[in-house]
């Protein structure tokens, strides 16, 4: 799984 979550 590839998740991109800019936090």
Swiss-Prot record:
Taxonomic placement: Eukaryota, Fungi, Dikarya, Ascomycota, Pezizomycotina
Name the UniProt record assigns to this protein: Colutellin-A
Role summary: Has antifungal activity against S.sclerotiorum (MIC=32.4 ug/ml after 288 hours) and B.cinerea (MIC=10.8 ug/ml after 288 hours), and weak antifungal activity against F.solani, A.fumigatus and G.candidum. Lacks antifungal activity against P.ultimum, T.viride and R.solani. Inhibits the production of interleukin-2 by activated CD4+ T-cells with an IC(50) of 167.3 nM. Lacks cytotoxic activity against human peripheral blood mononuclear cells.
Localisation per UniProt entry: Secreted
GO cellular component terms listed in the entry, alphabetical order: extracellular region
Main localization, broad class: secreted
Alphabetized UniProt keyword annotations: Antimicrobial, Fungicide, Secreted
Superkingdom as given in the UniProt entry: Eukaryota
Disulfide bond annotation, renumbered to this chain: none
Keyword match Magnesium: no
Example GO biological process: negative regulation of interleukin-2 production
Species annotation: Colletotrichum dematium (Anthracnose fungus)
């Amino acid at each position: 799984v590839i998740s991109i979550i800019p936090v």
